[in-house]
Amino acid sequence: MKFVDEAVIKVQAGDGGNGVVSFWREKFVTKGGPDGGDGGDGGDVYIQADENLNTLIDYRFQRFYEAERGQNGSGGNCTGKRGKDITLRVPVGTRAVDIHTNEIVAEVAEHGKKVMVAKGGWHGLGNTRFKSSVNRAPRQKTMGTKGEIRELRLELLLLADVGMLGLPNAGKSTFIRAVFAAKPKVADYPFTTLIPSLGVVSVVPEKSFVVADIPGLIEGAADGAGLGIRFLKHLERCRVLLHMIDIFPIDQSDPVQNALTIIDELEQYSEKLANKPRWLVFNKVDLVSEEQADEIIQEVIDALGWEEQYFKISAVNRQGTKELCYKLADFMEQLPREEQEVSEEEKVNFMWDYHPDANQGEVITEDDDDDWDDWDDEEDDGHVIYVRE
């Protein structure tokens, strides 16, 4: 199945049902009083995470989703039926972003998690609600409010512990082939990897972690150049980044400049991503002498001012890959997972407030020259009940 990690859809919550003007009619009861019921609330729109899905391809074909409208009220103080909700199933790790405000409306990172993305309209009030000691035959009602309409961009973010980044042909996919059973395409030309891929590394039965491989970055990626910018978002949930550096590039470019390019693109894309734990991994050490490799590595470390961990490997020969995986597994145990806390400022405000609108909604008055003289008017559209003697 084609991997689709973005889709734009439009969702519309159901409108609220209208209140109704009605009066109780019964034999021998000349003035039964108002009995108009309220309308029903409109249905809401939700997204729900489903671990059985791994792509957003379905939302490329159907782009409009609408919840059911609430039914109008009726006589006999009958409240209209609430509109049915609609739930959109998406892969685990999907977030919904409002394309107009760029705010994150919802994010589902666990199987079964369900979040509202569009709120249904508030029901209208029937004339019974307006009855008082001075207005015993009210002809006022309110209309239901409109349901919320949103245009959303669904973004699928892969859930992985370790994210790999580097220039094209740095050896990321070769490393993937070396450490687990997945066999991504490997070749000696740039952008061999076209879509992100995931793999599970099992060091020992009780120690494992998930690695995400994305297409290589190039200079200007943060501004949209190359393929990597589209997939950088998949690294946002990774707990540690592996920065793969080719010490013997096939295009004879400078490893120092290549390393600086990646860090610069990370910082331009997201400060949060740039501040994640990051390890340097120097690949292809088998292509040069040990002294030459150490010299190149030292130049890179000095240029970056690097004081953290770094590793020397040869992915094609699996030299140093096992030790790196053990180090990563130990690091995963020590590093706690980020807890997603929603602050007051981050909470999504819907376009209209659910309860206040009930009091501020438009009041509809049915005109009549004489409210008190029309109790027995057969042309009135009030609710009539006939009772057998």
From Swiss-Prot:
Segments for region (Disordered): 359-389
GO molecular function annotations of the record: GTP binding; GTPase activity; magnesium ion binding
Residues forming coiled coils: none
CDD domains xref list: Obg
Protein name, entry field: GTPase Obg
Subunit structure: Monomer.
PANTHER family in the cross-refs: DEVELOPMENTALLY REGULATED GTP-BINDING PROTEIN-RELATED, MITOCHONDRIAL RIBOSOME-ASSOCIATED GTPASE 2
